[in-house]
């Protein structure tokens, strides 16, 4: 899998996730610094891997999914980055984010390494989107070729709706 960050090719560590795969286990950290595992939630989930919520591209991506979350009622949306939970919480509060849950991968990098989104050179996550159904099967996986690009919002929302 080849991914670029601002035009320069970077190395992704971990295993690339494909449609049909079982979504891997991981532990992330919530805004209260508590560990969170999401494997057996018995609902459809959208995972947005982003480098940092506090950058213009990530900011717009999360705000867009937050605004459009009602289009996929009953689906949980998670944004995961290497940001510290305090920074994520501050940003969400300042931006009024209520329909997307932020999680941090700073502690163990388990999400990044288990989904093949961890950028070795930068210690950040590559931009990727995964839709996971209630039986923990991946129904949509997209690693953006350029980390500074935007996902196809309509395509992701359609995939999430279809996974219900």
UniProtKB/Swiss-Prot annotation:
Catalytic activity: a hydroperoxide + [thioredoxin]-dithiol = an alcohol + [thioredoxin]-disulfide + H2O
Catalytic site: 58
Gene3D superfamilies reported for this sequence: Glutaredoxin (3.40.30.10)
Disulfide bonds: 58-92
Miscellaneous information on this protein: The active site is a conserved redox-active cysteine residue, the peroxidatic cysteine (C(P)), which makes the nucleophilic attack on the peroxide substrate. The peroxide oxidizes the C(P)-SH to cysteine sulfenic acid (C(P)-SOH), which then reacts with another cysteine residue, the resolving cysteine (C(R)), to form a disulfide bridge. The disulfide is subsequently reduced by an appropriate electron donor to complete the catalytic cycle. In this atypical 2-Cys peroxiredoxin, C(R) is present in the same subunit to form an intramolecular disulfide.
Sequence similarity: Belongs to the peroxiredoxin family. Tpx subfamily.
Full protein name: Thiol peroxidase
